[in-house]
C-alpha cells in the first residue's frame, strides 16, 4: 500500500522563506500511527511542487480554510488518477458536507483519534464517508515519524508539541473548534524523549499557549534545562505576570515567543477576553519579557469593529515606542465556524466566500468604521512602512538589544524583516485592489487577471 500525505499551499509556486518556514508536524504524527508495512510519502507544497507522476493508493490532505480550494483541487486530481482521498483539518471539521463533495472520506477533529480506523477500513475496502475523531489522549501516541519529507528548517529547527487546546475563546479564533477549550498535555517524559530522538537542538514549539498551564509549564521548563536546547513558541502575554515561570522559560532555552497583542486600540481590547486591558499594560509586558532575555514577536490584527482609520498610525506608533523589530500583521479574518463569522454573516457583512481569500492579507468583510478598501490600504500602509528598508535599518539595534545577545536569534529576526518586506511587495504588486466602487471586490492573483484579460488597478498610495 502506498500512502501520500499532503500539506497544500494556497499560493502554489510561491515558496516560503526557509528562515520562517513552519515545520510540518501533523502529517508526521499520522505517519507514526500508520502500520510499518505502508510505504509513506509526505509532500509539503510550501517547499516544493507536488510530483503528480507518482501514483498512490490512499491520499490524505490536511486542509485549512485558506488552502481549502487548493486541497479540493488536489483531491479531485488524485481521485481522477484512481486514488482514494481523505480530507482532514480545521476546515473539513467545520464544513464536512462541503469537503465530502471533493473526497472519499472526511475526518472531523484531530485525526490521531481515528487514523488507524481510516487505514484499516481502506485496506478492507469499507472506507466510510465520515470519521469523527475523539480528542486523543496525548500520552498514548508516539513521537512524530520524522524524515519522510523536508520537516526541518534553518538551523535544523524541527516542530514540537507539548499541549493542545486553549482556555480562551476569542471571537475570531478557530483553535477551540479543532482542539477544544481544555488544555491537554503530553507527559513531560514523552516530550523529553521526542527531543532526544529528533537529533536537533533547535525547536519550534507549536502549542497555542506554551505557558497556558503554569504547573505543567514549570515541570516542562525544568525538564528542558539540562537538554541545552533552543526553542521558540507562542504564549499568552499574561506570562509577564509570572516571573518564576518567565525565568524558567528563559533558562529552558526559549529565545523568542509569539504573542497575540491583537490590537493597539483600547476600545478593541476592551471587547476581548484578554488578561491585559490597556496598551500601557501591554507595553510594560513587552519590557518585562524582553528584560528576561526573551524576544517579543507580536501579532496584530486590523479591522475590529471599534477600529477607525486612526488604528494604522497608532499601530506604527506602538511598534516605535516598544522598539519591536518584528511583527505579524493580519487583516481580521472571519473563519467559518467562528462566532465572528456567524455574526458578520447575520449582519450581511461577509463579501467573499472564496476560501483562498481567507489568508490574513485580504479583506473579506465590510468593516464597521471604514470601507473595505480603506482597511486594505491601511493594512498595506502599515506593512510597507514597518518593513521599509529604512525601517529595517532602524530595527537592527533592537535585534541585539535583548540580552544575553543571541546572534542566531538576531539573524532569524533580521530575515523575518526581509520576509516582511517580501510580503509588503507581494501585497503591492500581486494583489489587485478595487478602485472607487461601492462594493469591495476581493483581490485576485495578478496572473489570474492576466489569464482572463483583466487589468489590475494596482495599489494607490496612502
Predicted regions and their residues:
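Structural recognition of alpha->loop->beta junctions
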Residues: 98-117, 248-258, 314-329
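Structural detector of well-ordered beta-strand residues that form the stable sheet scaffold
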Residues: 86-87, 107, 129-131, 232-234, ...
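Hydrophobic anchor at the start of a short beta-strand
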Residues: 3, 40-41, 85, 203, ...
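Acidic, low-complexity intrinsically disordered segments
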Residues: 1-199
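Radical SAM [4Fe-4S] cluster-binding motif and immediate context
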Residues: 143-297, 302-304, 308-317
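Radical SAM enzyme core and accessory elements
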Residues: 2-5, 36-42, 122, 150-152, ...
Amino acid at each position: 500500500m502506498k500512502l501520500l500525505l499532503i500539506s497544500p499551499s494556497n499560493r502554489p509556486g510561491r515558496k516560503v522563506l526557509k528562515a520562517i518556514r513552519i515545520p510540518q508536524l501533523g502529517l508526521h504524527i499520522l505517519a507514526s500511527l500508520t502500520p510499518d508495512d505502508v510505504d509513506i510519502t509526505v509532500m509539503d507544497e510550501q517547499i516544493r511542487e507536488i510530483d503528480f507522476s507518482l501514483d498512490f493508493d490512499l491520499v490524505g490532505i490536511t486542509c485549512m480554510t485558506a488552502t481549502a480550494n487548493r486541497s479540493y483541487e488536489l483531491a479531485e486530481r488524485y481521485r481522477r488518477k484512481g486514488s482514494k482521498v481523505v480530507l482532514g483539518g480545521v476546515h473539513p471539521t467545520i464544513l464536512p458536507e462541503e469537503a465530502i463533495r471533493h473526497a472519499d472520506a472526511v475526518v472531523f477533529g484531530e485525526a490521531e483519534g481515528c487514523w488507524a480506523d481510516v487505514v484499516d477500513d481502506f485496506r478492507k475496502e469499507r472506507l466510510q464517508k465520515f470519521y469523527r475523531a475523539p480528542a486523543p489522549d496525548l500520552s498514548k501516541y508516539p513521537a512524530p515519524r520524522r524524515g519522510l519529507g523536508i520537516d526541518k528548517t534553518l538551523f535544523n529547527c524541527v516542530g514540537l508539541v507539548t499541549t493542545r487546546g486553549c482556555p480562551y475563546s476569542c471571537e475570531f479564533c478557530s483553535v477551540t473548534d479543532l482542539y477544544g477549550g481544555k488544555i491537554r498535555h503530553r507527559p513531560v517524559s514523552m516530550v523529553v524523549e521526542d527531543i532526544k530522538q529528533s537529533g536537533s537542538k533547535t525547536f519550534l514549539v507549536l502549542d497555542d499557549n506554551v505557558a497556558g498551564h503554569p504547573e505543567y509549564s514549570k515541570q516542562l521548563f525544568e525538564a528542558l534545562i539540562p537538554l541545552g536546547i533552543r526553542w521558540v513558541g507562542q504564549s499568552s502575554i499574561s506570562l509577564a505576570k509570572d516571573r518564576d515561570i518567565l525565568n524558567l522559560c528563559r533558562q529552558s532555552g526559549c529565545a523568542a515567543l509569539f504573542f497575540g497583542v491583537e490590537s493597539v486600540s483600547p476600545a478593541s481590547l476592551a471587547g476581548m477576553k484578554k488578561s491585559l486591558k490597556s496598551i500601557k499594560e501591554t507595553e510594560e509586558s513587552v519590557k518585562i519579557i524582553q528584560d528576561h532575555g526573551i524576544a517579543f514577536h507580536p501579532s496584530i490584527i486590523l479591522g475590529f469593529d471599534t477600529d477607525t482609520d486612526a488604528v494604522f498610525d497608532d499601530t506604527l506608533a506602538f511598534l516605535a515606542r516598544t522598539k519591536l523589530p518584528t511583527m505579524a500583521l493580519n487583516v481580521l479574518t472571519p473563519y467559518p465556524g467562528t462566532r465572528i463569522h456567524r455574526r458578520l454573516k447575520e449582519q450581511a457583512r461577509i463579501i467573499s466566500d472564496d476560501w483562498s481569500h481567507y489568508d490574513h492579507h485580504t479583506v473579506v468583510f465590510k468593516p464597521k468604521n471604514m470601507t473595505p478598501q480603506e482597511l486594505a490600504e491601511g493594512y498595506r500602509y502599515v506593512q510597507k512602512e514597518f518593513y521599509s528598508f529604512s525601517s529595517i535599518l532602524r530595527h537592527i539595534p533592537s535585534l541585539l538589544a535583548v540580552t544575553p545577545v543571541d546572534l542566531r536569534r538576531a539573524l532569524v529576526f533580521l530575515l523575518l524583516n526581509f520576509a516582511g518586506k517580501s510580503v509588503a511587495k507581494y501585497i503591492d504588486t500581486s494583489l489587485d485592489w478595487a478602485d472607487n466602487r461601492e462594493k469591495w471586490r476581493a483581490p485576485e492573483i495578478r496572473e489570474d487577471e492576466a489569464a482572463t484579460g483583466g487589468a489590475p488597478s494596482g495599489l494607490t498610495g496612502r
